[in-house]
Swiss-Prot record:
<feature type="repeat" description="WD 1">
    <location>
        <begin position="10"/>
        <end position="47"/>
    </location>
</feature>
<keyword id="KW-0690">Ribosome biogenesis</keyword>
<feature type="compositionally biased region" description="Acidic residues">
    <location>
        <begin position="275"/>
        <end position="284"/>
    </location>
</feature>
<dbReference type="GO" id="GO:0080008">
    <property type="term" value="C:Cul4-RING E3 ubiquitin ligase complex"/>
</dbReference>
<dbReference type="GO" id="GO:0006364">
    <property type="term" value="P:rRNA processing"/>
</dbReference>
<feature type="repeat" description="WD 3">
    <location>
        <begin position="91"/>
        <end position="129"/>
    </location>
</feature>
<dbReference type="InterPro" id="IPR015943">
    <property type="entry name" value="WD40/YVTN_repeat-like_dom_sf"/>
</dbReference>
<dbReference type="InterPro" id="IPR019775">
    <property type="entry name" value="WD40_repeat_CS"/>
</dbReference>
<feature type="repeat" description="WD 9">
    <location>
        <begin position="429"/>
        <end position="468"/>
    </location>
</feature>
<feature type="region of interest" description="Disordered">
    <location>
        <begin position="228"/>
        <end position="284"/>
    </location>
</feature>
<protein>
    <recommendedName>
        <fullName>Periodic tryptophan protein 2</fullName>
    </recommendedName>
</protein>
<feature type="repeat" description="WD 12">
    <location>
        <begin position="557"/>
        <end position="596"/>
    </location>
</feature>
<feature type="repeat" description="WD 2">
    <location>
        <begin position="50"/>
        <end position="89"/>
    </location>
</feature>
<dbReference type="InterPro" id="IPR020472">
    <property type="entry name" value="G-protein_beta_WD-40_rep"/>
</dbReference>
<dbReference type="InterPro" id="IPR036322">
    <property type="entry name" value="WD40_repeat_dom_sf"/>
</dbReference>
<keyword id="KW-0698">rRNA processing</keyword>
<keyword id="KW-0597">Phosphoprotein</keyword>
Length: 900
């Protein structure tokens, strides 16, 4: 039962900047996790790592290998993306407003409060302190909000809230006044600053600064002789019309011989930042000492809207600007020609970024939890994903374990592809919260129950609501099920305490089951019999024979409110959970209690900020609200008002394992001990909303209602969502399960879908390397290298290099992503190769070793599987015809009398 975290679905984008690497790989923060989406394959995966709180800043290395993730508590993770592991950790001393790798990948610029710090990127050598700070610029008068490196990684353009942008020379210069150049004239914060490059010389000749009030400043650079003699006084520098001579902003070398009235700043002389040799400096022009001229100032004309996100593409000379009213503009620079001006939503855009080629634009809206990628040339969407805005209430697997359906308080039903991690259907017909879901056995239709008084049936082929089940008097439905044959649909109510039974085909009410005296929150048909089990807050579980119309067959009484009910897959056992934290197991045939599990202590843990008692004494309110049997019925999963999902062995009534659904401190109930100094007269200080979201740039939070305390005269705060699990569902294959939690839908799986391939790091993947591996009898490695090269002749050569006795071992070592290519090669060999038994042996071992993987990815592998089936069928037919012909010939020869 080695379940591991595999993916996160349904979680909304909650803010922070998105990053695109390798032109098609979109990296975005999802709470305290990182989501990676391959736009070319439409595949999304969430990395199996967490930060302490919600992520607010991301930055990737130029080659896309490393990722920096900074959370709200200034803790930074240095992540290796190919291996999906955290390499290093560091904590900054103040809020991080901007973060960026240098183009050469050697340095990292971090805007920490008013400071700009230059850190050396961790290398491949092991070190006690992998991060090395090599320089600090303390020239800004307010928070730094934007950074941009020059192409040669020698200059840094910094924008801040003090209405100015500064150009720094990162290197230390000998005998030259290292004073930052100021770009002034802005009337609001500089939210974006970028370098423009001359396409002929590939040198910086322009700069663009974007103010929060919607004005774009274009600056031109002119080289001039600014070299200084070592004996020349610093005051001999001719003052620039846009650079005031401020003594407190000058950074000089220690003992550099500049005027004594200038303030000296001692800095660490970091390796790699020292100046060039004196002989090389004679012919060098320093960009921060040259002449910068304001060429033009253009306004976006968005009235009272503010700029909240922007990006610039050097190759296309284009600027994209996102505003607080949901409008974005795409402009051709430097002439400021508007190419597109469109509205995405009515909420502010929190991120806007180009891809490497510049043909795709990525936008994020934290208020709506929406992330989309748009091709501005063809005006089409490449990706449009939006998680559930509110908590997910229910989740269920399809019978083939390929699809996952979710329903939430935002009145929407979403259907997800489990393998790709993307949502491909969203149904919005419900007008109130969706409370229950049920997949039909045909795998093509879904039932959903809602508080709006309807039960709807959805068709996946036509993407529509083909039938709606209602009652004469509107009722609120909180539970739903259907019989295994799909003829009857049943739903339990919240207000009338009844169970309605409809005919699935006609939609007419067949029966109304009465007897419960409280809301019916649990409902399930027996998998093998015609019994219907219902649980209610009236301390009872009732069994009904719906088809015989006999009413209640049997009643199981409890000592507390019954919250949910679940049948074992064989239908001979029934599990029910109660408000006191117990799980009761009943024999449905004999009608007796078999086992009882005391789970209150197992689910205990986590203290909410408004709790008056400690976590150790707060277990009285903990209970299991959802249960789910395993495919074989040997263990059961239980979860509820806690941060844990518990797995129990039913026969021994012992806790096998406990899964913590999140370590995100932005949620309430994660910690066992709270800091007493954070308690004030108005309540916990963390629940007081004292931040101004309009000034937080790309950071925004979703509104979850008035959950906390309010200050007099201030608007109600948003509070913190409480961590819990509302629904569980185990895949029919038994190899994965899904949990609808506060963070989203977590998927845990036994199958290790990610296997790190060391050959991905090799630079010598050549045909010669394949030949050498074959000669060294490393056929597994040779096969992997040949499939990476994707050369058909090499792949076939490696297949024949494997001895028949070693085929099984080599087949097991083949990676999942190479299965399709290997099958295509086997199909070609079946059609053109005389070694039929050898190739069939390969096919047999591939199917044995990767059967579960092929079943999970059958949609992707379907073309290769069909080709393989056709090739085998054709070979079988040819052999059958030959054998039949030979058989008839032998019969004829045997029947001919021997005349000799």
């Amino acid at each position: 039962m080695e379940f591991r975290f595999e993916n996160l679905l349904g979680a909304p984008y909650r803010g922070g900047n998105a990053v695109i690497t390798k032109n098609t790989q979109l990296i975005s923060p999802v709470g305290n996790r990182v989501s990676v989406t391959d736009l070319s394959k439409n595949h999304s995966v969430t990395l199996p790592l967490e930060t302490s709180t919600n992520i607010c800043r991301l930055a990737s290395s130029p080659d896309g290998t490393f990722l920096l993730a900074v959370d709200e508590q200034n803790r930074c993770l240095f992540i290796n993306l190919p291996r999906r592991v955290v390499l290093h950790r560091i904590t900054f001393k103040d809020k991080v407003g901007a973060l960026k790798f240098s183009p050469n990948g050697k340095f990292i610029a971090v805007g920490i409060g008013k400071l700009v710090e230059i850190w050396r990127s961790p290398g491949f050598r092991r070190a006690v302190l992998p991060f090395e700070r090599v320089r600090t610029f303390a020239n800004s008068d307010d928070k730094v909000v934007s950074l941009e490196w020059s192409l040669d990684s020698d200059y840094l353009l910094v924008g801040s809230r003090d209405l100015a942008a500064r150009l720094f020379c990162v290197r230390k210069l000998k005998g030259v006044l290292n004073k930052p150049f100021l770009f002034l004239g802005h009337r609001d914060s500089v939210v974006g600053c970028f370098f423009g490059v001359d396409k002929m010389t590939n040198k910086v000749n322009r700069a663009f600064t974007i103010a929060r009030d919607g004005y774009i400043f274009s600056w031109g650079y002119t080289e001039k002789d600014v070299k200084m003699d070592e004996s020349e006084d610093g005051h001999s520098e001719p003052p620039s019309p846009v650079t005031p001579d401020r003594a407190d902003e000058v950074m000089v070398e220690n003992g550099g011989g500049v005027g004594t009235e200038l303030k000296k700043r001692k800095e660490y002389d970091g390796k790699g930042l020292e100046s060039d040799e004196e002989g090389d400096d004679d012919d060098e022009e320093y960009m921060h000492r040259g002449k910068w001229v304001l060429l033009r100032k253009d306004g976006c004309n968005q009235a009272s809207a503010k700029v909240t996100a922007c990006d610039y593409h050097q190759g296309l000379d284009m600027v994209v600007v996102g505003f607080s009213n949901g409008v974005f503009g795409l402009y051709q620079m430097p002439d400021f020609i508007c190419i597109h001006l469109l509205s995405i939503s009515r909420q502010k855009l929190t991120t806007a970024v180009f891809n490497e080629r510049g043909n795709w634009l990525t936008f994020g809206c934290a208020k709506l939890g929406q992330l989309l990628v748009w091709d501005w040339r063809t005006e089409t969407y490449i990706l449009k994903q939006q998680g559930h805005y509110f908590d997910v209430n229910c989740v269920t697997y399809s019978p083939d374990s390929q699809l996952l359906a979710t329903g939430a308080d935002d009145n929407k039903v979403k259907v997800w592809n489990v393998m790709s991690g993307t949502c491909f259907i969203t149904f919005t017909e419900h007008t109130n919260a969706v409370t229950a879901l049920h997949f039909m056995a045909d795998n093509h239709s879904l039932l959903s129950a809602s508080l709006d008084g309807t039960v709807r049936a959805w068709d996946f082929k036509r993407y529509k609501n083909y039938k709606t089940y209602t009652t004469p008097t509107p009722r609120q439905f909180v539970s739903l099920t259907a019989d295994p044959s799909g003829d009857v649909v049943c739903a339990g109510t919240l207000d009338s305490f009844e169970i309605f039974v409809w005919s699935k085909k006609t939609g007419q009410i067949k029966d109304i089951l009465s007897g419960h005296e409280a809301p019916v929150h649990g409902l399930m048909f027996s998998p093998l019999t015609q019994l219907l089990a219902s649980s209610s807050w009236d301390y009872t579980v009732r069994l009904w024979d719906v088809f015989a119309s006999k009413g209640t067959v049997e009643t199981f009484r409890h000592n507390h409110d019954v919250l949910t009910v679940a049948f074992r897959p064989d239908g001979k056992q029934l599990a029910s959970s109660t408000l006191d934290g117990q799980i009761n197991f009943w024999d449905t045939i004999e009608g007796v209690l078999m086992y009882t599990i005391e789970g209150r202590r197992d689910i205990a843990g986590g203290r909410v900020m408004t709790d008056r008692r400690s976590a150790a004494n707060s277990s009285s309110g903990k209970c299991f609200t959802t249960l789910c049997y395993s495919a074989d019925g040997g263990y059961i999963l239980a979860a509820g008002t806690s941060r844990y999902i518990c797995m129990y062995d039913i026969a021994d009534q012992v806790l096998l394992r406990r899964f913590q659904i999140s370590h995100n401190l932005s949620l309430d109930g994660v910690l066992d001990f709270l800091h007493s100094k954070k308690m004030t007269e108005a309540g916990p200080i963390d629940l007081i909303d004292d931040d101004n979201s309009d000034e937080e740039g790309g950071i925004d939070k979703q509104s979850r209602g008035n959950l906390g305390y309010d200050l007099p005269g201030s608007r109600p705060n948003r509070g913190r969502p409480i961590i819990r699990t509302k629904s569980l569902s185990i895949a029919p294959t038994g190899r994965s399960f899904a949990a609808a939690t506060t963070e989203g839908v977590l998927i845990f799986s036994i199958d290790d879908t990610f296997i790190f391939d060391p050959t991905d790091l090799d630079i010598d993947v050549t045909p010669e390397a394949v030949e050498a591996a074959i000669e060294e009898d490393e056929v597994s490695r040779a096969l992997a290298l040949s499939m990476r090269l994707n050369e058909d002749s090499l792949i076939k050569k490696c297949i024949f290099a494997v001895a028949p006795a070693d085929i099984k071992a080599v087949a097991i070592s083949v990676r999942q992503k190479y299965l399709e290519r290997l099958m295509e090669a086997l199909v070609d060999l079946l059609e053109n190769c005389p070694h039929l038994e050898f190739i069939l042996h390969w096919c047999q071992e591939i199917c044995k070793a990767h059967g579960s993987s092929i079943q999970r990815n059958y949609r992707t592998l379907l073309p290769a599987l069909r080709s393989l089936q056709k090739a085998i069928t054709r070979a079988h037919q040819d052999l059958a015809d030959m054998c039949s012909s030979n058989e008839y010939t032998l019969r004829y020869l045997c029947s001919v009398p021997n005349n000799h």
